[in-house]
Swiss-Prot record:
GO terms under cellular component: ribonucleoprotein complex; ribosome
Lineage: Bacteria, Bacillati, Bacillota, Bacilli, Bacillales
Organism: Oceanobacillus iheyensis (strain DSM 14371 / CIP 107618 / JCM 11309 / KCTC 3954 / HTE831)
Domain of life assignment: Bacteria
Family per similarity comment: Belongs to the universal ribosomal protein uL5 family.
UniProt keyword annotations, A-Z: Ribonucleoprotein, Ribosomal protein, RNA-binding, rRNA-binding, tRNA-binding
SUPFAM superfamilies named in the record: RL5-like
Gene name linked to the record: rplE
UniProt cross-references to InterPro entries, sorted A to Z: Ribosomal_uL5 (IPR002132), Ribosomal_uL5_bac-type (IPR020930), Ribosomal_uL5_C (IPR031309), Ribosomal_uL5_CS (IPR020929), Ribosomal_uL5_dom_sf (IPR022803), Ribosomal_uL5_N (IPR031310)
Protein name: Large ribosomal subunit protein uL5
MF annotations from Gene Ontology: rRNA binding; structural constituent of ribosome; tRNA binding
Length: 179
């Protein structure tokens, strides 16, 4: 079992129960899934760009990404409905905890001028969205093989009802929030 999951079960559940006065263990919020999304705007002109993005996303997540397609045609972007324009991965279970641990311990500290992540990126329902400017912060990505620096969105979906509960859960899991 992943050590982050073990820590959640052993320490975090009891600490959150004390802090928020839950009656049952089932009320305690937990991380449900992590969605990593990479929008590839270049894919309209250059189909090879999407292939490299899919390859990088599969290296980062350890799982095959799903290709996302355009919902509408937009003439200004030379975009037709159904064209592939990005890739996303949904992580659950063991892979989710492994990715979260890697993100907190290895990847986020590698960001240049890193002073912690914003406390304001919660959506009001207890989900946290994090934007990453470059994929090079992940140790699996080889700098020499990168054709273009791309960012990605990482959404951490929790079962908590309020942002305060989710913030406490993520902070105890080791997310480095700004002071």
């Amino acid at each position: 079992m992943n050590e982050l999951k073990q820590k959640y079960q052993d320490e975090i559940v009891s600490s959150l129960m004390d802090k928020f006065n839950y009656n049952s263990v089932m009320e305690v919020p937990k991380v449900e899934k992590i969605v990593i999304n990479m929008g590839v705007g270049d894919a309209v002109q250059n189909s090879k760009a999407l292939d490299s993005a899919v390859e990088e996303l599969s290296l980062i997540s350890g799982q095959k990404p799903m290709i996302t397609r355009a919902k509408k045609s937009i003439a200004g972007f030379r975009l037709r409905e159904g064209m592939p324009i990005g890739a996303k991965v949904t992580l659950r279970g063991e892979r989710m905890y492994e990715f979260l641990q890697k993100l907190v311990a290895v990847s986020l500290p590698r960001v240049r001028d890193f002073r912690g992540i914003s406390k304001k990126a919660f959506d009001g329902r207890g989900n946290y969205t994090l934007g990453v400017k470059e994929q090079l912060i992940f140790p699996e990505i080889n700098y020499d093989k990168v054709s273009k620096i791309r960012g990605m969105d990482i959404v951490v979906v929790t079962t908590s009802n309020t942002d305060e509960e989710a913030r406490e859960l993520l902070a105890q899991l080791g997310m480095p929030f700004q002071k």
